[in-house]
C-alpha cells in the first residue's frame, strides 16, 4: 500500500493506493473537512457515522481502517473508503462543494488506473 497526499482547494486529503485491489482509499475525516469546513471534522464524522448507522445506511459498513500519516508524523489507523463509497458519503453531507469535489474525486481516483494502461 502506498500513502499519498492529494490536494483539493488547498486542503490535504490523505489517500492510500491498494495495488492488490487497484483502488484508492480516501481519509474520511479529510473529506469531511473539505466539504464542511468544520472546526472539528473528526467529531462531525463521528456524529454523521452514528446517524447513518441508525438510518441503516451501508456507507459506514464499507469503511476500512488503514494506516495514514497523522499530523504528528506517525502512521495511525484512520477511517478510509474507496472512491465509490466516498461518493455515497458526499451525498449525505450538505455542501456547496459537493459537485466540485465529486469531479475532483473522479480525476483523483482514476490517476493510478491511467498509469497502468
Language-model features, listed with the residues they occupy:
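Compact nucleic-acid interaction/catalytic patches
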Residues: 33-58
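Positively charged, aromatic-accented nucleic-acid-binding surfaces
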Residues: 1-26, 33-39, 61-117
Amino acid at each position: 500500500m502506498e500513502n499519498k497526499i492529494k490536494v483539493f482547494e488547498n486542503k490535504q486529503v490523505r489517500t492510500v493506493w491498494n495495488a492488490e485491489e487497484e483502488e484508492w482509499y480516501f481519509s474520511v475525516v479529510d473529506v469531511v473537512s473539505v466539504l464542511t469546513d468544520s472546526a472539528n471534522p473528526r467529531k462531525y464524522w463521528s456524529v454523521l457515522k452514528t446517524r447513518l448507522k441508525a438510518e441503516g445506511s451501508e456507507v459506514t459498513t464499507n469503511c476500512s481502517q488503514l494506516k495514514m500519516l497523522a499530523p504528528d508524523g506517525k502512521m495511525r489507523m484512520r477511517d478510509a473508503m474507496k472512491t465509490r463509497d466516498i461518493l455515497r458519503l458526499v451525498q449525505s453531507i450538505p455542501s456547496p462543494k459537493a459537485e466540485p469535489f465529486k469531479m475532483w474525486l473522479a480525476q483523483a481516483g482514476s490517476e493510478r488506473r491511467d498509469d497502468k494502461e
